[in-house]
């Protein structure tokens, strides 16, 4: 056991959480990931705000290791394994991958790791923030314009930027903001929710818009948001 005998106080301005020492914890795993997360444990009184992304995650080895490190920290802060497993998936770990098979392996590995701490995790509607990067189809159909309104330019921008996403992967550099993506997502979901109130042709077109844009919006959000830790092992670069 390591005693942190120097009293400290950290505040997260966003969450308004405070913590003061001394505290006691097990010696963390001896790796760069461990040291980084334990440092953020002191910077962020609420570990839920510490976010890591592997932008070239492959089959998820780094994310799975980071999961165990984060579990140590959550336990140190008094969380149960069941709650910590869900919070790690939903709040802390993000990943992108261009290969579909590797993405499925990463998703499976993370869910199995989470299940080792929470046996009910598979029966819950848990949000997992790992995605396969998808390419766009190229151009918008003219008939989509009536549904997109003021969002047409943003949609066309995303489609243009992701035309070669399978080649470029996470190095795609987007100039849009999270706020713009949030507004677009709300608009698309609103269209989907009200699709039953329109004729069959319109329903089909709205479904096509939803299926085309939602994956692009999700991966765009991961590319534009900020992270505390970015770590990867891109062997092909």
Go through each PLM region and give its residues.
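SAM-dependent methyltransferase catalytic region
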Residues: 1-237
């Amino acid at each position: 056991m390591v005693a942190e005998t120097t009293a400290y106080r950290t505040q997260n301005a966003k969450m308004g959480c405070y913590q003061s020492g001394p505290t006691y914890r097990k010696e963390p795993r001896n790796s760069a990931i461990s040291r980084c997360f334990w440092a953020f444990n002191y910077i962020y009184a609420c570990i839920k705000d510490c976010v890591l992304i592997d932008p070239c995650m492959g089959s998820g080895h780094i994310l799975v290791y980071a999961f165990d490190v984060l579990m140590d920290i959550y336990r140190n802060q008094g969380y149960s394994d069941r709650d910590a497993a869900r919070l790690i998936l939903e709040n802390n770990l993000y990943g992108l991958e261009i290969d579909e098979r590797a993405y499925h392996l990463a998703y499976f590995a993370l869910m199995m790791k989470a299940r080792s701490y929470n046996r009910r995790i598979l029966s819950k509607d848990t949000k997992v923030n790992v995605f396969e990067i998808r390419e766009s189809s190229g151009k918008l159909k003219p008939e989509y314009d009536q549904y997109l309104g003021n969002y047409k330019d943003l949609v066309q921008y995303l489609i243009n930027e992701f035309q070669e996403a399978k080649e470029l992967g996470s190095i795609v550099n987007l100039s849009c903001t999270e706020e713009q993506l949030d507004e677009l997502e709300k608009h698309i979901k609103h269209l989907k929710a009200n699709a039953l109130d329109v004729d069959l042709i319109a329903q089909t077109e709205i479904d096509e818009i939803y299926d085309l844009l939602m994956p692009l919006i999700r991966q765009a959000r991961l590319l534009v948001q900020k992270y505390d830790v970015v770590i990867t092992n891109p062997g092909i670069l």
